[in-house]
Amino acid sequence: MRTKTLQSIQDMVEQLNRRQSMLGDYESTLEERLALVCNPPKRLQRMKIPRRKSEYSSHDRLKRARKIYLEVLENFPLIFVPFILVVPPNACRTWKASEVQRHLKDCEGIHLSYETRANFDGYCRTLRFGLESALTLNLVSCSRPTTITEADDAWAYNAADMDTAVKFFSEAIYKAIESSPKRLREKENQFVKSTQCIQMRFPRHNQQDAIVRLDVGFDSEVVKALFPTAWERLSSVHGFRSSSQSTNRNIEQLEPHLYDNACFTLQGATVSEIPTVLGPHVYRAIKESQLRQWETDNFLLKTTDCVSLDISRRQPYEGTLCLRVGFSLGVFMATQLYSFDR
């Protein structure tokens, strides 16, 4: 019985993550059980005529259910909504507080977008449950937002139109892409109009952040602007040279069997430099991302992990910028970058 219930809870988690909504078909059930959580059953008043046993049993079941629901809310807030939707009050009779810890500790929680969270917050306020309703406003993870594009279950776009790319990226980034080792190899193979130096990935089943990967070679000006502290260490400790052009000339000199796949990863890009270095279109798309909104809510104002850079540690220094952008503006970019006039 427990196994079946836990599987139903996990199925509900996946459904809520996919739909990015907790209302719709479940609205009446959700309202009923949130009301139970936020408003304890009133004490039965004494009567001249004794109440039926079923009334006492029903009252006890509600009290028992509320205790279990609150136990889940306190210890597993990200499973709370799936739990109350799947487990009705009557079924809580067989649950014990100790079992809640044991059975739910391995369940994955819900991870909803900020827009969905705002909608749910507004829904809770309209119900006017009272002070305890504040508990229900913390059901969305306060941890760093993830995106399914970091896994394999994503749509991938790999061949961008270079003529369109100049509209979305700054001149500096466009030139960095054009002079990158990967792009130079494409040109040698007559891939002039399209490039795999610009790739995008989107989640299949929800509207989490999209990922943009740009092969930009090693442009010292880009690195110094976005990651000034990291650049100082790269140049002083690891001996990186400041000329990207000199590294590009070493492509043919590097023997294949000596190729080193390891890389340095730079995170915490300077936010104020993003509009200049990456361009205003990309900056707006980054601001729209769930990750950037989370960073802002958590007072990470001057730097962002929405922009990271991988640099190979040996020549030719190949660099890949990884950008987290909002879903809607990411879709707009993709429809332009990957639409070719034939």
UniProtKB/Swiss-Prot annotation:
It comes from Aspergillus fumigatus (strain CBS 144.89 / FGSC A1163 / CEA10) (Neosartorya fumigata). The lineage of its organism: Eukaryota, Fungi, Dikarya, Ascomycota, Pezizomycotina. The N-terminal bipartite nuclear localization signalis required for nuclear localization and generation of the H-MORPH morphotype. Coiled coil: none annotated. A motif (Bipartite nuclear localization signal) lies at residues 46-68. Residues 151-181 are annotated as: RNA recognition motif (RRM)-like domain. The keyword Nucleus applies. Its main location: nucleus. Belongs to the hrmA family. One of its GO terms (cellular component) is nucleus. It is found in: Nucleus. This is Hypoxia responsive morphology factor C. The gene is hrmC. Probably modulates the generation of the hypoxia-typic morphotype (called H-MORPH) with altered biofilm architecture that leads to increased host inflammation, rapid disease progression, and mortality in a murine model of invasive aspergillosis. Keywords: Nucleus.
